[in-house]
Design a protein with these regions (language model features):
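Active-site beta->alpha loop and helix N-cap motifs at the rims of alpha/beta catalytic domains
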Residues: 1-129
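Catalytic alpha/beta core domains of metabolic enzymes, predominantly
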Residues: 111, 123-214
Length: 214
């Protein structure tokens, strides 16, 4: 009620996901209202997630801020607490050229040299889409291992999956929009990252099991 992050509730929620059989968590993303959180608040959140989840869940921490300095600070901190990967949307508000977005992402990635990097494509909110030319540029970064795709055309999943595999051999694509989970998995998404998964994890775990079982 005082507007502060509750470490106890962060830990309890993380344990809840473990108890439900969830395989991984995406921290400080859209559902976590990352844009409205300060750097120190986001550090507190990921520290308390890792206190419970380390070694039990795959943890991806979203580190993007609207300035590179804060994003780099969060990337370094993420690596120090042992996350499995960091993720980032492009800078928002001003539409930057692709070379600037690539420089932003690569600078963040370089700040966590031993940690995988996930591109977060959400053009309807970020204002910038992940084009194939920008994607190809990011494939030069050895730490880029996945895309979380929240664009509305579901076929983008197939496009990024095919291009990623061609560039790297193995490449992960996560379906973003919750309402497209089944369609996304059916056309090649390796998993899903979304908001309602945290509210009803049993449903989505069951759907994922049935899809995998054919």
């Amino acid at each position: 009620n005082e507007g502060n992050v509750s470490p106890e509730r962060v830990r309890a929620l993380t344990q809840h996901f473990i108890d439900k059989g969830v395989k991984g968590v995406y921290v400080n993303g859209s559902s976590g209202e990352c844009i409205y959180q300060g750097v120190e608040e986001r550090k507190i959140i990921i520290e308390n997630v890792m206190a419970v989840a380390k070694g039990k869940l795959t943890v991806i921490n979203h580190v993007a801020c609207n300035n590179t300095k804060d994003s780099v600070e969060l990337a370094k901190h993420s690596e120090s607490v042992g996350v499995d990967a960091i993720a980032s949307i492009p800078p928002i508000y001003f539409r930057l050229p692709e070379y600037s977005i690539a420089a932003y992402w690569n600078t963040i990635s370089e700040a966590a040299p031993n940690t995988d990097f996930v591109i977060y494509n959400i053009p309807q909110l970020a204002g910038t889409a992940l084009t194939m030319s920008l994607f190809a540029e990011m494939m030069k970064n050895p730490r880029v291992v996945a895309v979380k795709n929240s664009s509305m055309p579901t076929q983008d999943i197939q496009m990024f999956k095919a291009a990623g595999k061609a560039a790297k051999g193995e490449f992960v694509v996560f379906n973003g929009p919750d309402e497209q989970f089944v369609a996304g998995r059916a056309i090649g998404a390796d998993g899903g990252i979304g908001g309602t998964y945290g509210v009803m994890p049993e449903l989505f775990l069951k759907l994922n099991y049935l899809i995998a079982a054919g």
